[in-house]
């Protein structure tokens, strides 16, 4: 089986349906003895250019391990789902399980680093 990284963009009007879509696509992979190594919901983000007169869309990243038949079924599901504006599939050499740079940035913004807090405390005294 091969490893793939898939990013798909969902129409913002369908954002509440994203969790159901993710579950459906995860089931397609696991039903055929595949694995989902990483699954990240990046949320609603600004698009670089208009797609179908839409400025924002909901992004989802999946790293999976599956055979060609399963990948074909997934891509077929993406093509015939009107809520999915775009999708991209990349073949990877090995499974990727570490958080993506997008998620690392968000975690860094949401929680200050303990080392920085220690510095601030030391400087204050």
From Swiss-Prot:
Name of one Pfam family that matches: Ribosomal_S6
Database matches in InterPro entries: Ribosomal_bS6, Ribosomal_bS6_sf, Ribosomal_S6_plastid/chlpt, Transl_elong_EF1B/ribsomal_bS6
Span of the signal peptide: none
Biased composition (Basic and acidic residues): 116-125
Keyword RNA-binding listed: yes
Keywords, alphabetical: Ribonucleoprotein, Ribosomal protein, RNA-binding, rRNA-binding
CDD domains per the UniProt record, alphabetical: bS6
Entry's Gene Ontology BP terms: translation
GO annotations of cellular component type: cytosolic small ribosomal subunit
Region (Disordered): 96-125
GO MF term set: small ribosomal subunit rRNA binding; structural constituent of ribosome
NCBIfam families given in the database record: S6
Similarity annotation: Belongs to the bacterial ribosomal protein bS6 family.
Role description: Binds together with bS18 to 16S ribosomal RNA.
Official protein name in the record: Small ribosomal subunit protein bS6
Organism: Nitrosospira multiformis (strain ATCC 25196 / NCIMB 11849 / C 71)
């Amino acid at each position: 089986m091969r490893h793939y990284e898939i990013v798909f963009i969902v129409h913002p009007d369908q954002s509440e349906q994203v969790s159901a879509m993710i579950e459906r696509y995860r089931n397609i992979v696991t039903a055929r003895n595949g694995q989902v190594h990483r699954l990240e919901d990046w949320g609603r983000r600004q698009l670089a250019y208009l797609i179908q007169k839409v400025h924002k869309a909901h992004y989802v990243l999946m790293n999976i391990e599956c055979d060609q038949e399963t990948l074909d079924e997934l891509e077929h599901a993406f093509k015939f789902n009107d809520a999915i504006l775009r999708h991209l599939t990349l073949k990877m050499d090995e499974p990727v399980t570490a958080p993506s740079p997008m998620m690392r940035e968000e975690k860094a913004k949401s929680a200050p680093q303990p080392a920085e807090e220690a510095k601030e405390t030391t400087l204050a005294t």
